[in-house]
A protein has these predicted regions:
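Conserved C-terminal structural/oligomerization subdomain of aldehyde/semialdehyde dehydrogenase
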Residues: 1-4, 56-60, 89, 228-229, ...
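Structural signal for hydrophobic packing residues in well-ordered secondary-structure cores
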Residues: 80, 84, 99-106, 110-113, ...
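Rossmann-like NAD(P) dinucleotide-binding subdomain of oxidoreductase/dehydrogenase enzymes
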Residues: 142-277, 332, 414
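ALDH superfamily catalytic-core signature
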Residues: 204, 239-394, 457, 502-514
Length: 514
């Protein structure tokens, strides 16, 4: 039977459900509005908003101007003053009601995420579930975290498109729970519709949240440098992150800037290849479009044949395709490793990096192909990229020093432990690293030399949930660390002159357990 878009995820049906659930958040043309000054308004200049799944237009994203954003920030900062008079029990109650509403709309939000950012169903559901369970944990645990601390003020959030709920919505709700007013910018590349319902439900529950959309550069003066913003939470690339960091260093403002580094997996005197293969396969979730993806494997030369025996079959087994397709109306949505990348521009960027590396002498170990049976006939597949793996990428290539943020791996062969450590520290600071080694002592010794915030031994590390701290070393992270009590500390203050845990220009203070 021919493939079709599953009836349960037809876009027209989903947007109908969405407008019925939160009609106040949509204009007369059916497109989302911004949540400014406590009201859904300001359609701005609508910009085409398309899905990477098949290139079709989903709607128009409102692009507001700087002055409108400044008004939104001014109102949100004033709203903080009244929010500080709401006690913790009431804040808990309102956040809990919001979580109940999010849970009731879980399927709708998950389906929206599939269209907006191309996640297969299981990953889209996981994004929503981790948001809900994570904020629930804070509702239960936050009271001792707030002892002796007061909220900072208005928190501004500028986040990437890849985790609209488990990162952005989660942070917003915890920041409000801690007593702060919150404003966020919708990621331009994805999350417009899914975040619109989340913020509409939060606003209905009496939470002091605002949502704006527009060009990051155009709105930076309002959302970053504005004196009414007490703290900034940023998730994105190094180039934008560096510019933001430079604008904040001489200002009395808290910041948490999560950027990227090259996350490496080192293989040294290791034998459990089946376990490593399972880790590698899991690591391909969402096409490695996340800041904690492992994109570089540094392998002892004598182990390279056995490593490739475990590694290459994983790449051949990966299932990539349109996540919305079924072969009959009542069939379940497909189980895929990943769908499209976020847009065709990203695919083109990765192909250029790949061509540059091969042209400079890198060895092409694997170049996957898309299976046409996982797409509609004639559909746009320009945002899809099968996995690629390169051996010995020359040092003068961008792939050697930069995180690809997509399904391109690089393999480096070394002979000595010192080389292993040097190659794993290529970006002079990153978020996660791992060592595969049969000897725990050797693994710990190597791990101690890595410029990585988290180091795993025979396992991959990730952002983590609940009480697990998250941060980065070197250029991969600037400002306060987050996760567990550190997230609450980052948006509250105690005594004057407090030195938060984090990575700052004049000091780095690391948690004992990470």
């Amino acid at each position: 039977m021919a493939l079709m878009i599953a009836p349960s995820v037809q876009w027209e049906q989903l947007t109908g459900q969405l407008r019925s659930a939160v009609p106040e958040a949509f204009g007369s043309d059916g497109n989302p509005l911004n949540l400014i000054e406590g009201q859904w308004s300001h359609s701005g200049n609508g910009k085409r908003y398309a899905t990477a799944v098949d290139g079709s237009e989903l709607g128009r994203i409102p692009m507001i101007d700087l002055e409108t954003a400044k008004r939104a920030v001014k109102f949100a900062a004033n709203e903080h003053e009244s929010w500080t008079r709401v006690d913790l029990d009431e804040r808990r109650r309102r956040v809990s009601v919001c979580l109940d509403l999010l849970r009731a709309h879980r399927n709708l939000i998950s389906y929206l995420l599939m269209w907006e950012i191309g996640k297969p169903l299981n990953l889209a559901q996981d994004d929503v579930d981790r948001c809900i369970s994570g904020v629930e944990w804070y509702v239960e645990q936050i009271e001792p975290m707030l002892a002796g601390r007061t909220p900072l003020g208005l928190i501004s959030n500028i986040a990437s498109w890849n985790y609209p709920y488990s990162v952005l919505m989660h942070a917003v709700l915890v920041q409000a729970l801690a007593g702060n007013a919150v404003i966020a910018k919708t990621p331009t590349d994805g999350g417009l519709f899914s975040l619109t319902i989340g913020f509409a439900l939060a606003r209905r529950c009496g939470l002091p949240v605002s949502l704006v959309s527009g060009s990051g550069g155009a709105l930076s003066e309002a959302l970053v440098r504005n004196q009414d913003v007490a703290a900034l939470a940023f998730v994105g690339g190094k180039s934008n992150g560096r510019d933001i960091a430079a604008s904040l260093y001489d200002r009395d403002k808290r910041y948490m800037l999560e950027m990227e580094g090259v996350n490496c997996y080192g293989i040294w005197d290791y034998s459990n290849w089946n376990d490593l293969a399972a880790q590698i396969k899991k690591g391909y979730a969402y096409g490695k479009q996340r800041c904690t993806a492992y994109v570089r494997f540094v392998v002892r030369r004598s182990l390279l044949p056995r490593f490739l025996d475990a590694y290459l079959p994983v790449l051949k087994s990966l299932k990539i395709g349109n996540p919305l397709l079924v072969d009959s109306p009542d069939a379940p949505l497909p189980l895929l490793d990943f769908g499209p990348l976020i847009n065709p521009r990203k695919v083109e960027e990765l192909r250029v990096m790949y061509s540059e590396a091969v042209g400079a002498g890198a060895i092409n170990l694997f170049e996957g192909e898309l299976n046409e049976d996982r797409f509609l006939p004639g559909q746009d597949i320009s945002a899809y990229l099968a996995p690629i793996s390169l051996l010995n990428v020359p040092r003068n290539c961008r792939l050697h020093h930069n995180e690809p943020f997509g399904p391109i791996d690089s393999i480096v062969v070394v002979d000595r432990v010192e080389e292993l450590i040097s190659e794993m520290n290529i970006s002079n600071g990153n978020l996660v690293s791992s060592i595969a080694c049969d000897d725990p002592t050797t693994a710990r010794e190597i791990g101690a030399e890595l410029r990585s915030f988290k180091v795993g031994i025979n396992q991959m590390r990730s952002r983590g949930d609940n009480d697990e701290v998250f941060g980065g070393m070197g250029a991969s992270w600037k400002g306060c660390f987050v996760g567990g009590s550190y997230l609450v500390q980052s948006v509250t203050c105690s005594k004057p002159g407090e030195r938060p845990y984090g990575n700052f220009p004049d000091y780095t203070l690391l948690p004992e357990r990470r």
